[in-house]
Amino acid sequence: MASSGVTRRDPLANKVAIVTASTDGIGLAIARRLAQDGAHVVISSRKQQNVDRAVAALQAEGLSVTGTVCHVGKAEDRERLVATALNLHGGIDILVSNAAVNPFFGKLMDVTEEVWDKILDINVKAMALMTKAVVPEMEKRGGGSVVIVASIAAFNPFSGLGPYNVSKTALVGLTKNLALELAAQNIRVNCLAPGLIKTSFSKALWEDKAQEENIIQKLRIRRLGKPEECAGIVSFLCSEDASYITGETVVVAGGAPSRL
């Protein structure tokens, strides 16, 4: 069927969205786009000053955004984040799980148990537990949408980032399993896998110009991505336009190889 050519505004009107790790980079861009598309957004970060700065900036743009401190690895922080959304807006329709850490660079055989625990706790376990925390609230609303932020490293691992790569591959599996289990509750679960997006989190991979150029030469689109180029995809996945999509991973990586 051909498009009518009519642009629909505010596809997320009056939806309530939680976005973790959303005061900078990809998370901030996602929070901004969801709010621009009509959602009431609750952002979070581990540091209060970062939350305050991001909330002030987004509210200055006329967007419905509030925020709270949340370390996703702490149960009490996850509970507070959910409670903030409920107290302010009465429910939760959307969760975007973006939090991740990467405290290690080197060979897999040199990774300590402590590093493995930290990466898997934050990058994988906390994602599952954050979803668990919001599902009962989504059920009360008749359904919802979860977007898990992984990485192209799930398919095409970065050298020296073994534990991080493994954690992101695990998120693709988590997405598929959550989608399978939550479909009956009308909760869709999808995954975003960004390539090398120019953010402070990925700075170690692009601050050296020679290294950046080497990466760019492997891309079909010969440049690094921008956070905003991830945000629209997430908004789409959370909207009714994606109502028949679940368990999928969308790669936003400039054409970099991205299959297992």
Swiss-Prot record:
Keywords (A to Z) from UniProt: Acetylation, NADP, Oxidoreductase, Peroxisome, Phosphoprotein
Top-level EC class as recorded in UniProt: oxidoreductase
Modified residues (N6-acetyllysine): K74, K198
Gene Ontology cellular component terms for the protein in this record: mitochondrion; peroxisome
Positions marked as site (Responsible for the stereoselective reduction of 3-ketosteroids into 3alpha-hydroxysteroids and benzil into S-benzoin): F158, L161
Gene3D superfamilies per the UniProt record, alphabetical: NAD(P)-binding Rossmann-like Domain
MF terms in GO: all-trans-retinol dehydrogenase (NADP+) activity; carbonyl reductase (NADPH) activity; identical protein binding
Subcellular location as annotated: Peroxisome
Annotated site residues (Important for the maintenance of the quaternary structure, the catalytic activity and cold stability) in this chain: N177
Binding site for substrate: S151
Residues holding NADP(+): 18-42, 168
GO process annotations (BP): ketone metabolic process; retinal metabolic process; steroid metabolic process
Motif (Peroxisomal targeting signal): 258-260
EC numbers for this chain: 1.1.1.184, 1.1.1.300
Top-level division of the source organism's lineage: Eukaryota
Tissue specificity as recorded in UniProt: Detected in liver and kidney. Detected at lower levels in heart, lung, spleen, small intestine, testis, brain and stomach.
InterPro entries, per database record: NAD(P)-bd_dom_sf, Sc_DH/Rdtase_CS, SDR_fam
Catalytic activity: a secondary alcohol + NADP(+) = a ketone + NADPH + H(+); 3alpha-hydroxy-5beta-pregnan-20-one + NADP(+) = 5beta-pregnan-3,20-dione + NADPH + H(+); 5beta-dihydrotestosterone + NADPH + H(+) = 5beta-androstane-3alpha,17beta-diol + NADP(+); all-trans-retinol + NADP(+) = all-trans-retinal + NADPH + H(+)
Family: Belongs to the short-chain dehydrogenases/reductases (SDR) family.
Function statement: NADPH-dependent oxidoreductase which catalyzes the reduction of a variety of compounds bearing carbonyl groups including ketosteroids, alpha-dicarbonyl compounds, aldehydes, aromatic ketones and quinones. Reduces all-trans-retinal and 9-cis retinal. Reduces 3-ketosteroids and benzil into 3alpha-hydroxysteroids and S-benzoin, respectively, in contrast to the stereoselectivity of primates DHRS4s which produce 3beta-hydroxysteroids and R-benzoin. In the reverse reaction, catalyze the NADP-dependent oxidation of 3alpha-hydroxysteroids and alcohol, but with much lower efficiency.
Domain notes: The C-terminus peroxisomal targeting signal tripeptide is important for peroxisomal import. Once in the peroxisome, it is involved in intersubunit interactions.
Subunit details: Homotetramer.
Protein name, entry field: Dehydrogenase/reductase SDR family member 4
